[in-house]
Amino acid sequence: MIERDWEFEKIKKYKENALRENIYNKGNVKKYKECPYCGSKSFIKYGNYNRIQRYKCKNEECKKTFSNTTNSVWKYLKHKPEKWFEFIELMGEHTTLNECAAKLEISIVTAFYWRHKIFHAIENNYKPEKFDEVVYVDTYYTEKCYKGSRNKNYTYADKVKNKFDKMYGLVPRNVSVLIAEERGKMPLIRRTENDETIINNFNNNVLKIAAKDCYMRTDYFANKKLKNNLLQYNKKLSNATKKKYGLKIIGNRIEDKIKEDKKKNIMAYLTAWLSRYKGIATKYINHYYNFYSLIDSEKVFDYMSIFFELLKNGSYTSVEVLRTNHVEDY
């Protein structure tokens, strides 16, 4: 007698196992040269679990087991592998957490933590590596958002005032955002933290990856302190660079002979993109900026390549780390 399987459950199970096995094969995962817990280079194969190779550390003080998934961004994600692919694709389509949860049949809390696990992995793996020639530097200001905060307690009067302020545009835009972009490269977008200035933000994140004779270009509306900092920086450029771009320093401004093409207004696109999320807590905003930089990049990525890139290079981030890394300091 042939066993009935009208719902083709066995085929579905086989596809799931085959996909999981393919995901974690030797070519797709990080190869271990040492124990991820103690650093010992002495470890042995220790069987398989769900067709995934496991290992055991031979260090007497450790003796922990680990596998190809131990430091993967997908560690502890108990749902089917297909959902991990689908979730990245939905993120790229700016789908809300509610819609992701409904479509993938997961809880909103799970969707939230999946999103931030991926954000952390993307932030470690996809970032501007170097600026070489002409960098367009700009500043952008936004209001502070306390969405999801448990330490910020509002009275009814506070809520009424906040609603009134938003209605009439009275909310102070006191969060400064630094934008640095070079044609053909991934832009750098970063919020200025509470304990730093816009100048520190620029020096620590843009100058750090800029080539020696990189020209920093800005416009009239940029932050005055930042403009002055850029002026002092550009004065030190070599004569060859100044001649190349036709730089003339006139008082407190710089003129050049760079032909201005029709440049995309990155701030307008960024604001429109963020508005789809219906409010983002300021403590998380840098992750969204970094994700937008990936989307805005002229280099084309697809969700499959991102998945396997994060699988190989993205580091695992626990829920506990996500919570402690974003302590509410308002």
List PLM regions with ranges.
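Residue-level recognition of single "structural anchor" positions
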Residues: M1-Y330
